[in-house]
Amino acid sequence: MAIKIMIADDHSMIREGLKSLLELEGDIQVVAEAEDGVDCLEKLKICTPDVLLLDINMPRKNGLEVLQTLKSSKSKIKVLVLTVHNEV
């Protein structure tokens, strides 16, 4: 049975790149993508992935706020936090 993954990141190029890499594996299926935290939580109402790849820095609702919502709802979804931090 395939592992169901959702990708939540505000950069479409990152979502597409992760999806392409993950789908090279035969036992992984990307079941949903979200462009921000609000979109992520809405899609989680209709889709239950095994794993959520979650960016921290997103508009409207950031990844930490999404994590708090998942924690308060006692979600069983495993979350892997991915983020980019640029230093000058």
Segments from the language model and where they lie:
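Conserved sequence signature across two-component system core domains
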Residues: A8-D9, A34, L52
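Active-site residues of response regulator receiver
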Residues: D9, D55, T83
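Short hydrophobic/Thr-rich beta-strand motif most characteristic of the beta2 strand and flanking loop
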Residues: D27-E35, K43
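Acidic catalytic/metal-coordinating carboxylates
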Residues: D36-D39, N62-E65, N86
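Short amphipathic alpha-helix used as the core "switch/output" element in two-component signaling
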Residues: E42, L64-K76
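Active-site beta3 strand of CheY-like receiver
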Residues: C47-L53
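Receiver (REC) domain active-site loop signature in two-component systems and cognate sites
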Residues: M58
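A short, hydrophobic beta-strand element within the central beta-sheet of small alpha/beta folds
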Residues: K76-N86
